[in-house]
Amino acid sequence: MDLALLRTFVTVHRAGSFTRAAALLGLSQPAVTSQIRTLERQLGRPLFLRQARGVTPTTIGDELAHRAAPHLDALVEIAESGLDDDSSSRTLYLAGPPEFTTERVLPALTGLTGDDGQGLTLRVSFGTAEETLEGLSCGRHDLAISTTRPRGALLSATPLCDEEHVLVAAPRWAERIGADTVRLKGAPALDDLPVVEVHESLPFVSRYWASVFDCAPAATGTVIVPDLRAVLSCASAGAGLAVLPRYLCARALEQGAVVTLLDPVVPPLRTYFLVVRTGTLALPHVARAHEWLRHAATAWC
């Protein structure tokens, strides 16, 4: 059986689409379709059911993928191991949310770039979870940081760390509300405070309210700015309350620029995932960065 046909088959199985598999393989869609049909003729069985959007593997397709994929990944690892001495000089294409990537991920990965300029080179893109996972699926990125665990066989996700969300405001707002008022009265104590958020839907505030107060926020956004660092700056300047990751506002809390309005027994958490295309950890530079970040993240929690 032709290994090239098996490689195409496994890629289609993971991608769930001839179009996406063609992009990952650097082939035309007709070429991918032709290779799958050739393999199906050789086996005498259909491997995929064609759907309106993508393809679904048949039982024999799932069985073949289960048997073939680990061996193909091992062959890739063997082939790439010859590049191991040079893998430090290869380029890693990384994508993730701007704040977490800037504050946590990039400082950690600089340890792989090398003092002599001969280490790993980085190319970084920022985007939403949907954008970064789509880019990873299409082959634009090697590694993605996401707060959404991807579905399907194409992408493999590893939990990286949990970030704690904190309800903060400038000290004058805390003084205006009064000590322990939020703890005693709950969400209504905050109804008249302006809100600083990253989006009109108030994703951070809504998640916090649902988790801690078991209700939706009554207020709308007073300042909407699509960057958590800008949200912190606005909150520090007195623009209103905000819900922020603790790692991002820790220094501002230490300096007294903002204060916590409530310290719940169980604070809201959000999980970050380290995501790769299934099988690409056989590539030394991807595996090295993946392991490096997993180790670094043990100090982030």
UniProtKB/Swiss-Prot annotation:
Belongs to the LysR transcriptional regulatory family. It comes from Streptomyces antibioticus. GO terms for molecular function: DNA-binding transcription factor activity; transcription cis-regulatory region binding. Putative regulator that may be involved in stimulating antibiotic production in S.antibioticus. The keyword Acetylation does not apply. The keyword Acyltransferase does not apply. It holds the Pfam family LysR_substrate. This is HTH-type transcriptional regulator AbaB. Residues 1-58 form the HTH lysR-type domain. The lineage of its organism: Bacteria, Bacillati, Actinomycetota, Actinomycetes, Kitasatosporales. InterPro entries: LysR_subst-bd, Tscrpt_reg_HTH_LysR, WH-like_DNA-bd_sf, WH_DNA-bd_sf. Residues 18-37 bind DNA. It comes from the Bacteria. Keywords: DNA-binding, Transcription, Transcription regulation. Transmembrane segments: none annotated.
